[in-house]
Amino acid sequence: DFSIKAKNIRNNQHEGNDFGDFVKVLKGKLIRELYTLQMLSAYHLAFAQNACNFSVPGSGKTSIVYGAYAYLNSLPPEHNKFVDRLLVVGPIASFAPWEIEYKECFGHSTTIRRMVGVDARNRMLHFYSSERTEITLISYQSLAASQKDVVTFLKREKVMVVLDEAHKIKNVDGGLWSESHLSSAPYARSRVILTGTPAPNGYQDLFNLYRFVWPQKRIIRFPVHYLINLSTDRTASAKEKVKELVDDISPFFMRIKKSDLNLPEPIYHPPKLVEMGKTQQIIYDYIERKYIDYFEKEASIGGFTEKLKSAKLIRLIQCATNPNLLNKPLDDYLSEIGISSSLGIDDREIMQMIKGYYKEEIPAKYIEIAQLIKNIISRKGPDGKVVVWAIHICNMHDLQCYLHSQGIPSELLYGAVPNEEDDTDDNIITREKIIRQFLFCKLAHNVIIANPFAVG
C-alpha cells in the first residue's frame, strides 16, 4: 500500500535496495552532500512524487527538493515519474536561493528564467516557447494571472511544481491565488509544498495544502468548518479526531525540527557600553531634568504622566544615540511613528541647545561602530560583511555619512527603498536586490545599515 510505504520511509523504515539505489544516484548527480535527514526527506519526496515538507528554516528544503528532482530526472523519459522541468512559485525574495543553490548542488549552471518585470504577453510566450528553460521562478500573483498558460505548459511538459512559502494558498475562502494554484495542480507531474508554518491559524490551514499535493485523493477527510472547530476543541473526542487527522496526513509530509539540526550554541556577544561625549551628556542630563519637572507639575492629570514618560523615554533614546535626532520637534517625531502628538511639550529651549551639536563632537556610538566594523572586516577579509541595525531614519543617514568619512562605504535599507514587484524595472534598486547582492558578495559595499522593519 502506497500510504504505508510512504509512512515507513518517513519513519526511516525502508525495505530492499531502493534507498541505497537512491543514494547512489544522488552521489553521482549532486556535488553537495546531503546529511542523513535531508537524504531521507529527498527519498520520501521522490518516492511519494507529491508531498509536503514542513521543516524549519535553515534545514535545507531547497537542497531536499533538488535531491528529489535529480533522482526523478534520472529516470527514463518514458517513466511516469520522470520530470525535466521545475516551476517554483513563491515570493520574489525566495528566488535567489533556488538560483544560487542549483549550482551549489549540481556543480554547474542551468537555464533559469525569473518572471519578474515580465508583462502578460511575454509570460505567455515563455510558457508556450519551444526553447528549454529548466527552472522557471514565478510569484503567486503572476501565476494566478497566467493560469491558462501555465496549465498548457504543465500539460505539455513533465514539470515538478514547487510552492515555496506555501502559506500563500492556505486561504479556504476561495481566494484568487488559492483557486488558481489548486486548479493547476492536476496537470503537474510532481507537486511539492514547502512551508515551515503549515498550520499557524488552525488545522483548516492544512486543507488547501493537501488539496494541491493530491488533488485526486481526499487526504483530509474532514470538511473545513470541522477543522476550524477542531482547532479550539479540547475535549477527549476532539483529541481522537486530531489523532485521525495526523495519521491521515503523516505519510505525505516530512519535517526536520530545529533540534534535529545539531546547531552549535549561539555565540552571545555582551553589549558594549559606550560613554557619551561631554556635550551629549550635558544635553541628556538637561532633558532628564526637564521632564522630571513636568512629571511633578502634571501628576494630577490622569493619563498625562504616562504620556510624558513615553515622550521622555523617546527623547532620551534619541539623545543617547545621536543628539542630531533632537533637531526634529517631538510632536513631529511622535506623529511620524504613529503616536498622538498632543502632549503640549515646549521643545524650543532644547532645540536651541542641540542645533550646534555636530560642531562640538561626533556621537560616541558612531566612533565605536566604525571601529567595530573595521575590526570585523579586517578579520574576515574582503568577504567580511556587517549589518548595522538602526531605527531612526535620520540616524541611518547620519551614520552612513560618518562611516563614509572614515573610508567605510555602506548601503541603506529602509522603508524608502522599494520592494521588488512583478513589474519592477531591472534598473531599479529594491530591498530584495540589495539583500541578494549583499548575501552573495555582489554588492559594491560590505556594510548595510538596515531598519529591521524593512527587512522582516
Give the positions of each predicted feature:
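Conserved P-loop NTPase motor "coupling/switch" region that bridges the ATPase
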Residues: 82-86, 104, 112, 131-134, ...
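Conserved helix-turn-beta segment of the N-terminal RecA-like "Helicase ATP-binding" lobe
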Residues: 94-118, 216
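Conserved Walker A/P-loop ATP-binding site and its immediately adjacent core
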Residues: 64, 82-104, 205, 391-394
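Walker B catalytic acidic pair
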Residues: 164-165
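Conserved helix/coil segment N-terminal to the catalytic DExD/H
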Residues: 121-132, 140-157
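Charged, low-complexity
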Residues: 1-51, 110, 133-135, 139-142, ...
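Walker A/P-loop
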Residues: 49-68
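Conserved Helicase C-terminal RecA-like lobe
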Residues: 64, 69, 263-280, 303-448, ...
